[in-house]
């Protein structure tokens, strides 16, 4: 029997977090199960590196990405199933998805609220001409895969045929557990993220400054070349895929502040899942999926106001036993609900059902 052929169309190469976690980390498992897998990322690693360096990737380079993806459409019929991350062509109408729905079957995957790039975009022409672009992509798909309930609700409103929730998860084999929660040391509060999300730390800097004045802390920023305006001691570590777990293990407390905006409500709380996989206690804003991952007072704290953040951080800084208890409960939750293999075998059953295996 010939191998079933899967075509994955992620937005980014492996270096892009969403594509790495929603597509690339599963590829060895698909191949191990006997599937023939082809991957075609829309943007290139050169594009990502340019964006992360806060530079423009250049008109011609971006145009090349569009042409390369367009040429792929002439060979889509040879695949048994096509799985798209978000959309085929960013900021173009859903003509490609319409074409695909006529000649093959496709699924589409979302781990953030990309539909707000269209219905709440500052660009007047985008909002005017394509406010429901992602809704159309969802409706034409055979199945919509989403990372959380906020995205699921949008797929329901769009009229998606079938919807499945698959959280963004970790491979637990890669995540060691932090052991040292000694009371006799400087406490490291940490954050991991891409340069584009560093802005989420801005509102919390005054809180960290206050904490620094009252407790022995330092701040660890796993963020590449970016900096933040913190009055206390700060350590900045460039992000690498191979080094991210070791970087998290340098932390004692992991944080995930977020504003209460539509885009942020669609986030999948991946930072928290990473922290908790390493046995860290967490403090997070009660926004979107953060409220599902953090059980307040059991594996971390949810904090909204300045007073709540100060109280939560202060309690964890001064109580090593509480840090350990929260960390154990957090890791347990991750192992039960947010693992790569758990996701994969559910996903595989759906593919088998779709293809009649």
Indicate residue ranges for each PLM-predicted region.
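Donor nucleotide-sugar binding/catalytic pocket of nucleotide-sugar-dependent glycosyltransferases
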Residues: 41, 105-107, 114-115, 139-177
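Short hydrophobic beta-strand element within catalytic cores of glycosyltransferases
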Residues: 274-284
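A short, well-ordered alpha-helix in the C-terminal region of glycosyltransferases
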Residues: 315, 322-337, 343-349
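Conserved acidic donor-binding segment of nucleotide-sugar-dependent glycosyltransferases
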Residues: 295-307, 315-321
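Acidic donor-binding loop of glycosyltransferase active sites
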Residues: 142, 248-266, 280-281
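Membrane-proximal helix-turn-helix segments that form the acceptor-binding/catalytic region
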Residues: 67-79, 90-108, 112-115, 124-144
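Short acidic/histidine- and often glycine-rich active-site loop of Leloir-type glycosyltransferases
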Residues: 266, 286-297, 301-302
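Conserved catalytic-core segment of nucleotide-activated headgroup transferases in glycan assembly
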Residues: 14-29, 39-40, 171-175, 182-249
């Amino acid at each position: 029997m010939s191998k079933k052929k899967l075509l994955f169309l992620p937005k980014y190469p492996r270096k892009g977090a969403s594509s790495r976690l929603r597509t690339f980390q599963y590829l060895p498992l698909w191949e191990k199960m006997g599937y023939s897998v082809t991957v075609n990322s829309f943007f290139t690693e050169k594009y990502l590196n340019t964006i992360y360096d806060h530079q423009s990737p250049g008109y011609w380079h971006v145009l090349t990405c569009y042409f390369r993806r367009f040429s792929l459409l002439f060979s889509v019929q040879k695949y048994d199933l096509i799985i798209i991350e978000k959309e085929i062509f960013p900021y173009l109408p859903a003509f490609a998805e319409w074409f695909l729905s006529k000649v093959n079957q496709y699924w589409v995957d979302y781990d953030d609220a990309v539909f707000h790039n269209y219905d709440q975009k500052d660009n007047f022409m985008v909002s005017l001409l394509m406010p429901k672009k992602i809704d159309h992509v969802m409706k034409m798909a055979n199945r919509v895969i989403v990372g959380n309930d906020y995205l699921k609700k949008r797929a329901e409103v769009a009229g998606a045929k079938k919807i499945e929730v698959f959280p963004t998860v970790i491979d637990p084999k890669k995540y060691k557990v932090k052991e040292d929660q000694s009371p006799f040391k400087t406490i490291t509060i940490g954050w991991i993220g891409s340069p584009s999300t560093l802005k989420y730390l801005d509102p919390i800097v005054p809180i960290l400054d206050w904490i620094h004045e009252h407790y022995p802390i330092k701040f660890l920023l796993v963020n590449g070349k970016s900096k933040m305006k913190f009055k206390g001691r700060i350590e900045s570590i460039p992000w690498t895929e191979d080094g991210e777990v070791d970087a998290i293990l340098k932390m004692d407390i992991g944080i995930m502040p977020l504003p209460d905006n539509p885009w942020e409500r669609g986030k999948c709380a991946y930072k928290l899942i990473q922290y908790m996989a390493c046995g860290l206690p967490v403090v997070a804003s009660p926004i979107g999926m953060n409220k599902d991952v953090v059980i307040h007072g059991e594996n971390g704290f949810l904090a909204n106001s300045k007073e709540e953040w100060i109280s939560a951080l202060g309690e964890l800084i001064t109580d090593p036993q509480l840090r350990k208890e929260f960390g154990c409960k957090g890791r347990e939750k991750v192992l039960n609900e947010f693992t790569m293999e758990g996701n994969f075998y559910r996903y595989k059953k759906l593919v088998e059902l779709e293809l009649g295996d």
